[in-house]
Amino acid sequence: MTQIRTMTEQDVPAVSLLLGQSWRYTYSPILGAETTARLSDEKHAPERLAAELRDDSKMSFVAKRADGSLAGYAMAAMDDKGEVMLERLHIDKGEYGTGLAADLLLAVLAAHAGIPSIALEVIEGNDRAIAFYRKHGFEVVERREAAHGVEGRASLIMRRLLPMA
């Protein structure tokens, strides 16, 4: 059984490790191993993750197993217009198919109750993620070139409209 809670500073090393593993597994076949490693090391450095925790516009969640190990992580950011972007949702490969990713997504949505929609960016070719988000009500609204600054790799912007309470 996993418990989802708000991320703390103590979670930073494990989250950094999980993100590195998840990125390498997911994106190496799409972006190449070298590019994936470079981007992941830049984006998921512990000091960067710790700084994000201090940013009031961002909310981060972790899913912890009963033994205390990290099973998943999600982070969403709200811009100055009140629009929310799901920046990250990653789970340990061993958790695929368990419903954990859906639970993390629900935690993010619950934390942002009352917003009209939530968006995300996914690299074209990440078919597993695209299928997951479609299953959970997201639709492609835009295609962008140079996903994550990588020329020749497009990304899809997906959005889910949310019921207003």
Feature-to-residue mapping (PLM):
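Helix N-cap/coil-helix junction residues
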Residues: L100-A101, F138
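Extreme N-terminal starter segment of soluble prokaryotic enzymes
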Residues: T2-Q3
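A short, structure-level motif marking secondary-structure boundaries and short turns
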Residues: E34-T35, G114-I115, E121
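C-terminal "cap" of GNAT-fold acetyltransferases
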Residues: F61, V84, S117-I130, K135-H136, ...
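Acetyl-CoA-dependent GNAT
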Residues: T6-V12, S16-Y96, A102-A111, R144-A146, ...
